[in-house]
Regions:
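N-terminal secretory signal peptides that target proteins for export/translocation
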Residues: 1-9
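Low-complexity, intrinsically disordered short segments enriched for Gly/Pro and polybasic residues
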Residues: 1-2, 15, 34, 196, ...
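Bacterial N-terminal signal peptides
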Residues: 14-25
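Sec/Tat signal peptide C-region and signal peptidase I cleavage site
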Residues: 25-32
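Outer membrane beta-barrel
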Residues: 34-67, 72-227, 233-234, 318-333, ...
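Outer-membrane beta-barrel pore domains
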Residues: 35, 47, 66-67, 71-74, ...
Length: 411
């Protein structure tokens, strides 16, 4: 039965990929791959049209938290780890087809978003691997493993964030930030409007009631300069005047059981978000950046079951909340670089944040400073944050303070 469900899902995605491939190769093929890549890198010219480019980037963190270690778990913890450590091969195959392959090692990390784990966690995988076909500016196709076209901050370049990192609380359940599938997207009305429709794997566990693609849609309206690539920047460092309003939704039928042991209580997954991004250079003084988003993730109350699917609860499970952030880039350099102070505020409510911890609310408040020596290609960051739990009756939900430092390099 499990094999049949997986086979049906695989056939559905395969059919979409076949249709995509037919369109691509009948029409000549795609679009320059867009990602959070640095300028420069090693470029290999293949012919007058085709080329391949190699980039390397990393973010090395030094982190401190005032809890998590010692016999009682109440002593301070220090941790050095690669938040991101990437080798990327991208390029253009024809005037209509481009591609990207991204390998990443992350870790070994002990300080997690709301806890300090006993054993450091690291991972090495193919983070992204997809092709982009451009039939016109209004009709483009992505196929492969790519960023999930849902939350704006997930779609923002990982090496162009305003704050040190994106929110810890906005990831999609099961697949988090990347998923495998297809996306139809494009720009309309001189790139004032962008749309994205996607069908991706979503939940793949044998414990799911159904095996169905996760369907998604996203649209944005750019009122000033366009944001017309598959993805955004967390800050354009004063090179654009941007005011963009976006919204997105996801749906996956039969994504989770409320009781996985008895395989009862079929629950659908739905989520929606709305976001706003504003960046404006103020003459020769500097650049103001403001951004925020609301997110609601719903598994139709799966957490109330006796043995809910793990993906329907916890950090990425059923929740609602929002974040807001603001920054200011000083135009004049101090020493070899520019400074960019920022602040960030988030409020979240979880159905079940940890086992038995229901309706927990948390507030995340942080601020920091970026020192941009060579734009985003050489950046030093410092961030101080406080995570405040509304209910501290559980020993696992005590307020804590975190200090992160970051060295970011890209070439």
């Amino acid at each position: 039965m499990m094999f049949i469900r997986m086979k049906k899902k695989g056939l559905a995605l395969f059919a979409m990929l076949c249709a995509f491939s037919a369109v691509v190769f009948m029409n000549g093929s795609a679009y320059a791959a867009q990602s959070c890549l640095p300028s420069g890198g090693a470029t290999i010219k293949i012919d007058d049209t085709a080329y391949m480019r190699i980039n390397y980037q990393f973010q090395l963190y030094g982190a401190w938290r005032d809890t998590g270690s010692g016999p009682a778990g109440t002593d301070a913890t220090t941790d050095f780890f690669f938040r991101r450590n990437r080798l990327t091969v991208s390029g253009v195959a024809t005037d209509k087809l481009s591609y990207i392959l991204m390998l990443e090692h992350s870790g070994d990390r002990k300080i997690a978003p709301v806890e300090v784990v006993d054993e450091a966690v690291g991972e090495f995988n193919v983070l992204e691997g997809f092709v982009i076909a451009e039939l016109s500016d209004a009709v483009k196709f992505n196929a492969g493993k790519m960023k999930i076209p849902f939350m704006r901050e997930i779609l923002e370049g990982c090496f162009s964030n305003l704050s040190l990192d994106r929110s810890l609380f906005i990831y999609s359940p099961y697949q988090r930030s990347r998923d495998t599938g297809v996306a139809l997207w494009g720009n309309l009305l001189k790139s004032k409007i962008q749309y994205i429709f996607s069908a991706m794997d979503g939940q793949e566990s044998v414990d799911a009631p159904k095996s169905s693609p996760r369907y998604g849609g996203r649209v944005h309206l750019a009122l000033l300069d366009p944001e017309d690539t598959y993805g955004y920047s967390g800050t354009y460092l004063g090179n654009k005047m941007v005011l963009t309003i976006g919204a997105a939704a996801q749906y996956e039928p039969g994504a989770a059981y409320s009781d996985t042991a008895a395989q009862t209580g079929d629950k659908d997954y739905t989520a929606w978000t709305a976001d706003l991004f504003f960046e404006y250079p103020i003459g020769s003084v500097g650049t103001v950046t403001l951004s925020g988003a609301y997110l609601k993730t719903d598994f139709d109350g799966a957490y109330t079951g006796s043995n809910p699917d793990p993906g329907s609860v916890g950090l990425d499970g059923e929740k609602k909340g929002w974040y807001a952030k603001a920054g200011y880039l000083h135009q004049n350099k101090i020493g070899p670089g520019q400074i960019q102070p920022y602040v960030r505020f988030e409020k979240w409510e979880y159905a079940e944040l940890m086992t038995g911890m229901y309706r927990q609310k948390l507030t995340w408040i942080g601020g920091g400073l970026n020192y941009l020596i060579n734009g985003q290609n050489l950046r030093i960051g410092l961030e101080y944050s406080v995570t405040d739990f509304e209910d501290e009756s559980d020993p696992r939900s005590k307020d804590f303070t975190t200090i992160n430092t970051m060295l970011q390099v890209g070439f």
